[in-house]
Amino acid sequence: MQISRGGFAIRNHTLVRVHTDSGISGLGEGIGNALLVKAILKEQMCELAVGQDPFNIEALRQRLLDSQVYFERQGSAICAASAIEMACWDIKGKALGVPVYQLLGGLVQKRLEAYASDVYWQKDPSDMAKEALRVV
């Protein structure tokens, strides 16, 4: 399938695991160009995150984004910072023994309709159907 941005069949994501000195680890995901996200994490952001308080998420996010002023705090830099931030939310939820949604304001609805606003677009609709069945 073609969309205004063009077609694509593969997406790469970057998974980040953040470990604390108390033995808790959190998992985060960075979307976007995986090579760029990985490079930003490895060469800049991981070093900035080490030793920081994973409960002070806003300050850590700001520290990470401040390191990216030359990239205008957008694109792959945001994706890299978001991966670490997501991992910190996971750590905080585990440490407090609550699901992350409670930390973000609580349950609003018991059920949500699933949708895909930007799936892995294939040129052939039957290939898309096969891929959708595989990931559900």
Language-model region placement:
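Structured beta-strand/loop patches that form or line metal/cofactor-binding pockets in enzymes
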Residues: 1-27, 31
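A generic structural signal for short
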Residues: 4, 77-78, 119-121
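Solvent-exposed alpha-helices and their adjacent loops that cap or buttress functional pockets
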Residues: 7-10, 106-108, 136
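Short secondary-structure boundary/capping elements
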Residues: 10, 100, 123-127
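Metal- or metallocofactor-binding catalytic centers and their adjacent structured scaffolds
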Residues: 19-95
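N-terminal small/glycine-rich loop or linker at the start of catalytic domains
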Residues: 22, 71, 95-120
